[in-house]
Amino acid sequence: MKSNSVVADIVANQRKLERKRWFVILSFLAIGVVSLILDVMTGPAMLSVSEVVNALFGIGEVDKMTDNIVYNLRLPMALMALVVGATLAVGGAEIQTLLNNPMASPYTLGLAAAAGFGASIVIAFGSFGLPVQVAVPIGAFVMTMLASGILFLFASKRRFSSEMLVLVGIALLFIFQSLLSLVQFISAPEVSQQILFWLFGSLNKATWQSLIIIIVVTTICVALLSKELWKLTALRLGEDRAASLGINLQVLRIKVLVLVAMMTATAISFVGVIGFIGLVAPHVARMLLGEDQRFFLPGAMLVGAAFLSLSSVLSKVIIPGALFPVGIVTSFIGVPFFFWIILNNKRGQ
């Protein structure tokens, strides 16, 4: 009887925990929807909630100007904020899980710096016959995948630990930042300014075509990652414990890195460098949802989506009418959070 009571208590606690987790996930989903509407409302020509809702759902009569503002200008940017936020959050979440390092993210592994270098080459030296709006994303994507290839090379080595992979990522970060600085130094002032603006990260480049590309790539990569959820959850117990459960760490490491690199490269190539999403969102999701990847992964996506969407709203109201880069807003929020992580780790030690 006593053992049955213990089992019943465990089951009840587990159900209570799952209800709490679903509540958190649904809460961030609601925040994302609200922030989407706010993002579409906000701009030089402020729209009311009713105007946005009527335009989005085709309710009543909507004048052509409002319809054009919503569908051709603001909605692609607002949806891009949600999708890119979710994409970068997944990348950061799985990199942190894989490397068991709270400071790890696609940004700190040098992928963002590589994208910046690739974009700067195209901006400074020409688009090689392609339209600039096509060539810049291609340059950023190619260079990000090159940096990822270097990480894959080291990750494929049997005795190469997660800590050493982080060090390789930091080395790549400094290498590509140095190359980027060199390109800016030898470029004309107006070209250097264009590079700098791209590096700030901006959702103003959003189009329906680029949005669809990111959605397709992210959906495929997340679907493939979802097949490895139990392995990634087990990995949080430690590499030795995961290996004892029959998990091939080398294969898992390469697979996760490939998928994260694809998502990150695609997102960054279209919107520029937007830092700290991949660092902040996973930590918030982990604090509220725990390490179970069934809840942690969708939770991180929703936190990242809401974070970037709200940052997009803030970027429009800081200087009304000005194109304030959203990457600056995320950095202002992310830097204090980064210090908080460092102090927390220090106390834990």
Whereabouts are the PLM-identified features?
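Alpha-helical transmembrane segments in inner-membrane proteins
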Residues: 1-349
